[in-house]
Structures are given as C-alpha cells and as structure tokens.
Amino acid sequence: MRTSLLPVSWIPAFLFLTMAFPAAADGGERSPDPVIAAAPGDSVAADSADVEPELDLDLGGALRFNVLFEEFDRTNRQKTGEFTFDTFRVNADGTYGDLFFSAEYRFYAGYRFLHSGYAGYEVQDDLDVRVGVHQVPFGVQPYFSNSWFFNLAYYAGFEDDYDAGLKVRYTPGNWTLIGAYYMNAEQTGFAGGTTFARYSFDVVPATTDDLGYAGLEADRFNQEINQFNGKVAYTLEAGGTSTTFSVSGQTGQLYNRSTTGTERHWATSVDLDGQYGRFNLRLGLIRYEMRPPGTTGPGRDAVVMAAYNAPYRVASKGRFYSGGLAYNLPVDLGPISRFRFYNDVSYHDKAPDAWVDGASNITGILTSAGPLFIYTDFLVTRNHPFSLPASDFGSALAEGSEEWNVAFNMNLGLYF
C-alpha cells in the first residue's frame, strides 16, 4: 500500500500525541475468525542489519449472506423471510521488517467502499505508530458487541469507528495507552464510493431530498474534522481471570462547508471488559454532544449521520448504556469447534425529553466451524435503525417512536 508523506500541519499533532499519549491497541474489523491483520509484534525483520527484510503478505477475504425474518415487515412475513447477499470483502495484510500494513475493501449490494487502510512502524515491542484509515481508539476494542447487529452506540459512531489520521499506541505491562489525531472521517470517493457509502457512521452533508421524510427541514453541510482521541486501559489479572478497565475521550470540530463555520463535538466512555473462565462480561457508559454549525433552534437537536449508503438523523446529545454477557463452549461436533452464547443490551438516552429513547436486547449464538461462522440473533428493539419499518429509519435515533419490533437473523460468513 502506498502512503503519502504527512502534511506539515500534522507535525505538532504528532509531537503532542507522542508525548501526551504513548498509545494503545488498535482495533480490528468485525470478523469472528482469527484476526487476519498482522500484528506489529509479528515483524519479520532479520536479526542482522546486513540481511534484507522479507515481505510477508497475507491475502484474504470473506463472503457473507443474511437470512432475515422481520415480524414488522408485511412483505417479509408473507415471503416467510428473505435470503440476501450481505458483503464480499478482500483483505491485504503484511509486514516488511518493522513496517506493517493493512487494507480492506468491501462490496455490498449497490455500493462499495474502503473499510480501512493504513501503514505503520514498530518503534519497539510495545510502541508503534500507524497512519491511514484505522480504528478510532474509543471504548472496548476491537468490539463491545457480541452480536452481528452491534449495540445502539455503533449507529451513532461510537463503536468500531474508522477515520483518517495518525495513531500511536504504547502497551507497557498491563497498561494500554493510545493517542490519535484524525484530520477527517474516512474519505468515501475512493474507487467509486459515495458520501453515504462507508463502513462506520459519521456526520455527513445531506439534503431535504435525502431526509425530508424523516423531519429534516433544511439542507445540512456538516462534516467531521480535527478530532483528537485518547484512551487509557489497565488489565487486572488474578486467579486465571482478567478485568480490563478503560477510559476514552474524544473531541473535535464539525465543519460547515456552506458557512465555513465550526463548532465542537465531544464524547467520553467508561468501560469494563472482564474474562472469567468461559464467561465474558462487558459494561459501558458513553456521554456525547455534537453541536452542528449553521443550524439554530430545534434544528440543533439532531445531526445527520450515514453509513451503508443510508443517512439518518441522530440526537445531538445523549448517553448510551451498554452491557453484554457471553459464554464460550468448546465442542467437537464434526466441523463445529465452538459455540458462543451471548446477550447484548443497550439503551440510548436522548437529551430532548420529548423524544423516545432507544432500547435493544439481542440474544444469540455464534457458531464456529473452520472458515464458516454463523451469527444467529433474536432481536427485541425500539428505535434500532436497522430493525424497524423503513418509514421510521431516518428518525429512529432522533424523535423515534414507541413501537417495539422483533426480528430474527442468521448471518452466514465464509472467511478465507
């Protein structure tokens, strides 16, 4: 992967991050298979400076389908569910001495985008630097959620988020420290992508033609720039168990392309990730606020965000409460080697009291069989944007509705 030199304007940010945040573990992408991306510690650099390093390249990908049943969708009920294409992706990961790199591109029905792409340098065993489009250090990583559908915080850009910038990570002993600076969200014009077609949710420009049906009364021209992130985590180990406590924070600007004005956005997260034998427990609290420039009055109560080629409105201030409990059961049933039973809960507390809060409970099983991974999820949700009637999609994370919805989904993924 070719990477351009850093602009001069990044140098102060880099020096600040290096001194203030000697940095933490990078996340990954949502694949239940053993992580494909080469870790910096897997460097193939030779012991002798006289020996040329070798290029170690891994190529891979995945093909996934969904089997979906939605009780709230009349057509889906009449057809007794649908078997649909989810995604096809290609990955390239590797190392060259102390250098490492990773790239992933995804294809969906009708759109495509760059999921991630970065290059990095391993300064020492517990310190590395990476630049490009990579996971934002915020909350439990690589994922808080166990289910294929994620928790509600993901849909507001606070879980498994990817942006374009520079990250430093430092992992001394049981500590994990991260500092990062992102010039902007990932650019989506690469290889035919569109503004709305991206993997993770970001504040984006949109028009009333896009979201007039969902209450957008005027065109929006906002986007994310100049975001700083910091994360500190500590893992406490005792008697074969481990508990990781982490605190994350981010702050940046929202830029209005029409007025050229900017305003601030920020978020904080406090999390616990515990591994107790075969059980895993995760708890998290997120507080956030986004102040959209160029808007006044009630229009400031929501921002426009998008991913997967679909925009919607999100409450500009609120909290997310999340929890997850999982149990890993190794088995020997033909090709099946493991079941992971889980229950994920999340709650979206929106700042305008008149708006209906969001809630989600997802109970499921992840079945592992060699390269085949199957998520089986049963969802009971309110104002989950991807589990409700299409007419409510654009306002689910804003005004919302009182309706509860039930769905059942199986995601079948072949990873290679």
Where are these regions (language model features)?
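Outer membrane beta-barrel
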Residues: 51-72, 79-188, 193, 234-237, ...
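Solvent-exposed loop/turn segments connecting transmembrane beta-strands
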Residues: 80-82, 105-114, 159-161, 222-224, ...
